[in-house]
């Protein structure tokens, strides 16, 4: 049976204010929002029902904002574990440590997607000062827990000339590109 992937935005809460983010765009800036726990449960079971009807296996990409900031983040991971549903988290590095990564792995997290949008100066301008170094540091943290650390880059005219060196940097830090 084939997988059907759901990218699930559970919260707008985020520690960064990325230049290219739709949540905090100047003309669309709005109050931060998040799904309630009952909404999350309903959505989860609706996705499972969909997959049953279409003979697919569910796979979730949990994102936001930074999903780890959602007050029901661990409840959601518990629900995933209870139903043996594989998932990837697309989030920030700031709340990761060995304990958090170990716990995510216990719940079944397969991959954690981090973002690097250029070398230090460019990336920190895009996202938040200190984010570049923190992101590289957390690759090792994720890997120690047995979670694949993958890196995504939003390529633009601002960073395109840095991409070859960025790839070398990510490979040197042993990301699971």
Annotate each language-model stretch with its function.
Residues 1-110:
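Conserved alpha-helical substructure of the radical SAM core
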Residues 9, 50-62, 81-88, 110-111, ...:
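Conserved C-terminal portion of the radical SAM core fold
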Residues 16, 121, 149:
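Glycine-centered loop/turn positions within well-structured domains
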Residues 28, 67-69, 93-98, 112-129, ...:
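Conserved radical SAM core fold
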Residues 35, 39, 115, 131-134:
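Short acidic-hydrophobic sequence patches enriched in Asp/Glu that either
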Residues 102-106, 127-129, 165-168:
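Short low-complexity, flexible loop/linker segments enriched in glycine and/or proline
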Residues 104, 108-119, 175-177:
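Non-cysteine beta-strand/loop elements that form the S-adenosyl-L-methionine
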């Amino acid at each position: 049976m084939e997988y059907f992937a759901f990218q699930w935005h559970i919260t707008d809460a985020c520690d960064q204010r990325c230049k290219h983010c739709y949540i905090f765009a100047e003309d669309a800036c709005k109050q931060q929002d998040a799904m309630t726990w009952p909404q999350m449960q309903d959505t989860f079971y609706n996705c499972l029902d969909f997959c049953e009807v279409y003979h697919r296996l569910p796979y979730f990409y949990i994102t936001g904002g930074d999903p780890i900031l959602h007050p029901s983040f661990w409840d959601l991971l518990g629900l995933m574990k209870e139903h043996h549903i594989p998932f990837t988290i697309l989030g920030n590095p700031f709340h990761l440590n060995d304990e958090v990564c170990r716990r995510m792995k216990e719940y079944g997290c397969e991959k954690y997607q981090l973002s690097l949008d250029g070398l230090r100066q460019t990336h920190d301008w895009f996202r938040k000062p200190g984010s570049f170094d923190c992101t590289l540091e957390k690759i090792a943290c994720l890997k120690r827990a047995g979670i694949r650390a993958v890196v995504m880059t939003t390529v633009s005219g601002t960073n395109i000339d840095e991409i070859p060196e960025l790839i070398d940097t990510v490979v040197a830090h042993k990301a699971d590109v």
